[in-house]
């Protein structure tokens, strides 16, 4: 048989954090930055609703969800687009803006899907160097050419946990050419409580050359339902709607997201839990000479440079005990580091107890 020829991509496929380990039960997955507290009780109630019309197509425009987003975040309904996870928003932006001769700038250590979607449409990905794992505005500006169309930044950044301040983001937008679209990923903004931080949406909701993307996969706990959203100028959102799949966000995801937005108590509890537990984990690890970033999201980047064991050794030892962390060598190319998701109180205690036992 002859297989018709298809395009060949010179890309490294995204590798999600492991979920299973052969022959081991009671696994703790601390590799994917998922919600430590699960989902809101309001969401659970929706998921138990037997009247869901799953035989019918969902609202393709996600009107009710967009209205709820508009209400909660005080932004224009017409400037909102919903996607099957924020991944799909990233994909649509790349499809809309990039062609093979174009360039997109992404920080050296950043969410892998920025580069993957850009490469799929044939654009050249240009990496800006980071300083001490922090995005550098000067390094981004150095990489700008006439071919630059997009700049992607996650703030706080995944997997490093560092962030740009309010003043730094404003400075970056001023220094970039006006015809370059700045895409700010607010995936972890709910966890960030530093006074010098401001979310991309709060800073640029009325700008014509900024698109902000957000997700329901992290603090809202809807990772499996795949729902995210973007906010930008009406012209850009209208153009994205032309290439958006007609029923891209399913009915259950839309209804769950609406209820998740309404539950302030769950969000507040999640933030408090994260700060308390992350600091507890940091303090325990410091005694083992494992350093990490300050708490800016629901994960920590663990640094083993001063530790008597390597990151790879600890990764394998923990895995043999049923605890999965994220290696930063795969895809990110960050040596001797591990990314740790902040889990439930019980999960974090087991992690601390297990890693202490490895050292003893």
Swiss-Prot record:
Associated pathway: Amino-acid biosynthesis; L-histidine biosynthesis; L-histidine from 5-phospho-alpha-D-ribose 1-diphosphate: step 7/9
Q: Which cofactor does it need?
A: pyridoxal 5'-phosphate
Q: Which residues carry this modification: N6-(pyridoxal phosphate)lysine?
A: 218
GO molecular function terms attached to this record: histidinol-phosphate transaminase activity; pyridoxal phosphate binding
Entry annotated with the keyword Transferase = yes
> Does the keyword Transferase feature in the UniProt annotation?
yes
User: Which biological process annotations from GO are given for this protein?
Assistant: L-histidine biosynthetic process
Q: Kindly give the SUPFAM superfamilies that the UniProt entry links to this protein.
A: PLP-dependent transferases
Q: Catalytic activity, per the record?
A: L-histidinol phosphate + 2-oxoglutarate = 3-(imidazol-4-yl)-2-oxopropyl phosphate + L-glutamate
How does the record describe its quaternary structure? Homodimer.
Task: Write down what this protein is called.
Answer: Histidinol-phosphate aminotransferase
Species annotation: Pelagibacter ubique (strain HTCC1062)
Name the gene.
Answer: hisC
């Amino acid at each position: 048989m002859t297989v018709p020829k298809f395009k060949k991509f010179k890309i490294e496929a995204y590798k999600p954090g492991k979920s299973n380990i052969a022959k081991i039960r009671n696994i703790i997955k601390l590799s994917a930055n998922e919600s430590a507290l699960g989902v809101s009780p309001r969401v659970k109630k929706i998921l138990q609703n037997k009247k869901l019309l799953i035989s019918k197509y969902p609202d393709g425009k996600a009107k009710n969800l967009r209205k709820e987003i508009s209400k909660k975040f005080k932004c224009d309904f017409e400037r909102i687009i919903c996607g099957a996870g924020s991944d799909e928003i990233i994909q649509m932006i790349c499809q809309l803006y990039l062609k093979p001769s174009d360039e997109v700038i992404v920080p050296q250590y950043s969410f892998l899907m920025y580069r993957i979607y850009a490469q799929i449409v044939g654009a050249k990905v240009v990496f800006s160097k980071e300083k001490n794992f922090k995005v550098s505005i000067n390094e981004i500006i150095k990489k700008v050419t006439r071919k630059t169309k997009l700049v992607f930044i996650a703030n706080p950044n995944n997997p490093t946990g560092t962030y740009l301040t309010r003043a730094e983001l404003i400075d970056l937008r001023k220094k970039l050419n006006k015809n370059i679209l700045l895409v700010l990923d607010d995936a972890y903004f709910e966890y960030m409580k530093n006074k010098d931080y401001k979310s991309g949406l709060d800073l640029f909701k009325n700008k014509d050359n900024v698109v902000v993307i957000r997700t329901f996969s992290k603090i809202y706990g809807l990772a499996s339902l795949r729902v995210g959203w973007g906010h930008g100028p009406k012209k850009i959102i209208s153009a994205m709607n032309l290439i958006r799949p007609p029923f891209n966000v399913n009915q259950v995801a839309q209804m769950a997201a609406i209820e998740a937005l309404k539950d302030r108590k769950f969000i507040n509890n999640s933030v408090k839990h994260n700060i308390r537990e992350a600091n507890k984990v940091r303090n325990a690890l410091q005694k083992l000479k494992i350093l990490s970033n300050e708490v800016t999201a629901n994960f920590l980047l663990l640094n083993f440079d001063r530790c008597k064991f390597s990151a790879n050794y600890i990764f394998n030892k923990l895995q043999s005990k049923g605890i999965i962390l994220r290696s930063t060598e795969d895809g990110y190319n960050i040596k001797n580091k591990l990314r740790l998701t902040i889990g439930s109180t019980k999960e974090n205690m087991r992690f601390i107890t297990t890693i202490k036992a490895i050292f003893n």
